[in-house]
Regions:
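Beta1/beta-strand and adjacent pyrophosphate-binding region of the FAD-binding site
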Residues: 2-14
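Internal hydrophobic alpha-helix adjacent to the cofactor/substrate pocket in enzyme cavities
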Residues: 418-438
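C-terminal auxiliary extensions adjacent to catalytic cores
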Residues: 464-509
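A glycine-rich dinucleotide-binding beta-alpha-beta segment and adjacent secondary-structure elements
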Residues: 345-411, 418-420, 438-455, 461-465, ...
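N-terminal FAD cofactor-binding segment of flavoenzymes
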Residues: 20-82, 443-449
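Predominantly flavin-linked oxidoreductase catalytic cores and closely associated redox partners
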Residues: 112-238, 280-339, 343-354, 358
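Helical element adjacent to the flavin cofactor pocket in flavoenzyme catalytic cores
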Residues: 99-118
């Protein structure tokens, strides 16, 4: 009997995990990836699971929310999490990987699997009437053509925020006489290079950062949204009608998004690009919308002179062995690969011009002669308004044979994306075998993420990392009885893992 087929589009993190899960559950998988024939503004290689931002899969501290999510993934035999452990580099209590080894490991897993066929071409059309189950896992850099196709199917405008990438420096260019190795609060091993600041050095750095020139916004970053264009067009049409004395409806205003009166589709925007040029020049473009968990340092600095000292440059817990005290501020560097010949500047994603980055970042103590292997940059992250279009099993409400996985679904972060792929692969396999998939329990970290992206208020939906705020809270009586936050988190994790194990046993029967 032939194996049921599953088609997966996207070779980032969610797609390969979904492919390996579905193949392990008896499906014949076709995995589509457009690279290298068409790349994105952030990718550098054609490999699967290329990490384009940091190299960290977050905390491994027991009973933390990121740890809980990874524990659930381990119990579900996540292939990419196993690859992360196989390519791990020292990073204190965090799980960080050698990017190239991690990507190579995943690529080998995919290429060597007899039940996975790789097709290197761009997919621009989706057939919701096909008998084949399809998982769309094209990530935050989904191509314009596929984004338009997805919009056509969902009748929903995609959303986006701007994400940034941290710089990487050559290890040999770091002045080790000015820095020191330590882990915050001495958790784990001393795997981070710490660059300590005095108050004077910090003030000078902030002044230079605040005055630095950023990369001019690309045209698409400042294009009015469909709603803004329509509102402007209505206003101009009203003015024309007022001057002409006509109250007749303007027929050109009827091209609105299906199912959403008053909002024009992005396709309509592209077909009426002339409106962009005709838009009022006095109206400033909207400020870029950033994900709060990954703000560019210049954006953080705009929020106050000392804001960075309470964020990426927080000195708390980083005792300088030369002084026996915490510095006024500190920048941390995390090892990029097993050779330890390159280090990334933790949390220092930015949108400055390259020449400005070199000038400003060389004000960091120990990096005065830094050689940059990669500068920071910014790119657009696209995601769906999932509460409006997705079911708790990641299926499109109107086209249930199409599933959405990874960052496109509204989760944020490497681990969360892999987790979404794990679920989508299992859901797709169940559907392909003629079964009804069961969503993960609300108590679990996976279930909490799914609940968030499918039950949030659609109007104000924003991507989310896994946190205890998303998890099912303890009963009020128990919360009052247990005051210690760590103990409450331990109980939440214990309940989550118990519910997850029960779900796993049911879903594999």
């Amino acid at each position: 009997m032939p194996k049921p087929k599953v088609r997966i589009i996207g070779g980032g993190l969610a797609g390969p995990e979904a492919a390996l899960q579905a193949a392990s559950l008896g499906c014949e998988v076709t995995l589509y990836e457009m690279r290298p024939h068409r790349s994105t503004e952030a990718h550098l290689t054609p490999d699967f699971a290329e990490l384009v931002c940091s190299n960290s899969l977050k905390s491994e501290s027991e009973n933390s929310a990121p740890w809980l999510l990874k524990q659930e993934m381990r119990r579900a035999d996540s292939f990419l999490l196993a690859a992360a452990h196989a390519s791990q580099v020292p990073a204190g209590h965090a799980l960080a990987v050698d990017r190239q080894k991690f990507s190579a490991w995943v690529t080998t897993l995919i290429d060597s699997n007899p039940d996975i066929t790789v097709v290197r071409e761009e997919v621009t059309r989706l057939d919701p009437g096909s008998d084949e189950i399809t998982i769309l896992a094209t990530g935050p850099l989904t191509s314009p053509a596929l984004t338009a196709e997805l919009q056509r199917l969902t009748g929903s405008r995609h959303l986006a925020f701007y994400d940034s990438i941290s710089p990487i420096v050559d290890a040999g260019s770091i002045d080790m006489d000015k820095v020191y190795l330590a882990a915050r609060w001495d958790k784990g091993t001393a795997d981070y290079i710490n660059c300590p600041f005095t108050k004077e050095e910090y003030d000078r750095f902030i002044d230079a950062l605040s005055a630095a020139e950023t990369v001019p916004a690309k045209e698409w970053e400042h294009l009015p949204t469909a709603g803004q264009l329509l509102e402007d067009r209505l206003q101009r049409s009203g003015e024309e009608a007022h001057h002409s004395g006509s109250g007749a409806e303007n027929p050109s205003l009827t091209a609105t998004r299906p199912g959403a009166p008053g909002l024009a589709s992005e396709t309509w925007v592209s077909q009426n690009a002339q409106d962009v040029q005709n838009a009022p020049k006095t109206t400033p473009p909207p400020a870029p919308k950033y994900f709060e968990g990954c703000l560019p340092i210049e954006e953080i600095a705009r929020r106050g002179h000392d804001t960075l000292r309470f964020g990426p440059m927080k000195p708390a817990g980083l005792t300088n062995p030369r002084t026996g005290r915490w510095p006024y501020a500190a920048v941390q560097l995390r090892q990029e690969n097993l050779r330890a010949d390159s280090w990334n500047i933790v949390g220092f994603q930015n949108h400055m011009k390259y020449s400005e980055q070199a000038r400003v970042l060389r004000l960091i103590p120990g990096l005065e002669n830094a050689k940059f292997l990669r500068y920071g940059q910014i790119h657009r992250n696209t995601y769906l308004n999932s509460p409006a279009v997705l079911t708790p099993t990641l299926q499109l409400k109107d086209h249930p044979r199409i599933l959405i996985a990874g960052q496109l679904s509204g989760v944020e972060g490497y681990t969360e994306s892999i987790a979404g792929g794990l679920l989508a692969g299992r859901f797709a396999a169940a559907l392909a075998h003629g079964r009804i998939p069961e969503p993960p329990p609300r108590e679990s970290a996976h279930g909490s993420l799914i609940h968030y992206i499918t039950h949030s208020e659609a109007k104000n939906f924003q991507p989310a990392n896994v946190t205890f705020d998303l998890l099912l809270p303890l009963e009020e009586e128990l919360r009052k009885k247990i005051r210690d936050k760590k103990e409450r988190h331990r109980i939440q994790c214990e309940r989550a893992l118990e519910a997850w194990d029960q779900w796993l046993s049911r879903s594999t029967e």
